[in-house]
Regions:
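Short, compositionally stereotyped local motifs that mark structural "simplifiers"
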Residues: 100, 106-216
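A generic structural signal for short coil/turn motifs at secondary-structure boundaries
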Residues: 1, 72-75, 166
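Substrate-binding clefts and catalytic carboxylate motifs of secreted carbohydrate-active enzymes
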Residues: 20-141, 149-153
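Single conserved hydrophobic/aromatic residue that forms the stacking wall/gate
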Residues: 1-8, 13
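Glycine-rich loops and low-complexity Gly/Arg-rich segments
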Residues: 10, 33-37, 87-92, 170-172, ...
Length: 216
């Protein structure tokens, strides 16, 4: 039982509010003290009142995030870990849980925040392309609906496993790919912001395990 009866408290939960954690499993994530992941949606979804009796919630004064700096040696890296996570933390503090909407936050307010940060030159974490995730998938054909995290960003991709560069093909919003029988394609994509800032690389391995028909 959380001892909130005697003193006011600020909540900082390890699973949801330790901002030194990595956001994804991508190989190009910075080194972190923790091996667990903290995506933005998990931060936004945290409810400080959960598990606390209604009569005790008046002792909860606010929410707090921690940033452990054993592997964070520059102000720029600290800014990268904090932005845009700090906006999700703010909404935890001032929005009743029944009024929170991840979709509204991620599709309306977050893009506006990201555009302002990018224009300011402040270091921040640029989200990877929306509509595709790291992993593996099997089949003959695959379809994706891809969105950049905010207007003005480009999504570049490769199909040979190489890290996408500025000169690689731009991924359209509706993206279809067919994989020949018995073959595999390594789809990699990255967001590139107007400032030139890049997201981590998303890698999806697509495999068609159907065998080719051998002529008799």
């Amino acid at each position: 039982e959380i001892p909130l009866r005697l003193v006011g408290s600020e909540m900082c939960i390890r699973d949801s509010l330790y901002f030194d954690k990595k956001a994804t499993d991508s190989y190009d994530e910075p080194v972190s003290l923790s091996s667990s992941l903290l995506p933005l949606e998990k931060i936004y979804g945290y409810d400080p009142d959960e598990g606390i009796a209604p009569e005790d919630r008046r002792y909860l004064l606010g929410v707090q995030a921690n940033l452990w700096t054993e592997f964070i040696r520059t102000e720029g890296r600290a800014s990268f870990q904090l932005l845009p996570r700090i906006y999700a933390l703010a909404e935890i503090a001032w929005s009743p849980v029944e009024r929170k909407s991840w979709r509204e936050f991620s599709e309306v307010r977050l893009p506006a925040h990201l555009a302002r940060i990018d224009a300011s030159g402040e270091p921040y974490r640029l989200p990877a392309p929306l509509g595709i995730e790291d992993g593996t998938s099997e089949g003959e054909s695959f379809s994706f609906v891809i969105r950049p995290p905010f207007p003005g960003c480009k999504v570049r991709y490769t199909l040979n496993g190489a890290v996408p560069q500025d000169f690689d093909r731009e991924m359209p919003e509706k993206f279809d790919i067919a994989v020949p029988r018995g073959e595999q394609r390594t789809l990699r994509c990255v967001t590139i912001a107007p400032s030139g800032r890049r997201s981590t690389v998303t890698t999806l391995v697509l495999t068609n395990r159907m065998q080719t028909n051998n002529p008799e």
